[in-house]
Amino acid sequence: MSAYRFRRAHRLLKTDEFSSVFSLRQQRSNAFFQVFARPNGLDHARVGLVVGKKVAKRAVRRNYIKRCVREWFRLNQQGLDGVDYVVRAKTAFTREQRAEAVTALQALFAKLARCRASSSS
């Protein structure tokens, strides 16, 4: 079985799950994304995505943004154990800006990891 699958268990699906991550308010943001984090007590990370109509009016664009974030999470989930993340898009990006947006997302997750490491030690 591949370690790079994005199973249902790795997704935040219910309103309560999203609310619990938002209530902790451990977050970092940049021009493209705002990422909220909360320890979940599981052996794997979970992710939830929020892309509003104010960010991207067309569903095609919103789905593209979510697809890009899901793909990044799928490929990098091994290093993100035991945390629930909610990724909120702040700005829509085009295919030409995808690499820049993914780099920005990587930087936010790295900042949150450093923050969690410093607060736990």
UniProtKB/Swiss-Prot annotation:
- One GO term (biological process): tRNA 5'-leader removal
Q: Which Pfam families match?
A: Ribonuclease_P
- The cysteines joined by S-S bonds are none
Query: Cell membrane among the record's keywords?
Result: no
Would you name any one GO CC term?
ribonuclease P complex
Q: Which UniProt keywords apply?
A: Endonuclease, Hydrolase, Nuclease, RNA-binding, tRNA processing
Q: Per its UniProt record, what PROSITE patterns does this chain match? A: RIBONUCLEASE_P
> What Enzyme Commission number(s) does the record list for this chain?
3.1.26.5
Kindly indicate whether the keyword Chloroplast belongs to this entry. Answer: no
Q: Which EC class heads this enzyme's classification?
A: hydrolase
GO MF term (any one): ribonuclease P activity
Q: What does this protein do?
A: RNaseP catalyzes the removal of the 5'-leader sequence from pre-tRNA to produce the mature 5'-terminus. It can also cleave other RNA substrates such as 4.5S RNA. The protein component plays an auxiliary but essential role in vivo by binding to the 5'-leader sequence and broadening the substrate specificity of the ribozyme.
Matching entries from PANTHER family are given as: RIBONUCLEASE P PROTEIN COMPONENT (PTHR33992:SF1)
The family line of this record is: Belongs to the RnpA family.
What's the subunit arrangement here?
A: Consists of a catalytic RNA component (M1 or rnpB) and a protein subunit.
Record's protein name: Ribonuclease P protein component
Q: Identify the species of origin.
A: Chromobacterium violaceum (strain ATCC 12472 / DSM 30191 / JCM 1249 / CCUG 213 / NBRC 12614 / NCIMB 9131 / NCTC 9757 / MK)
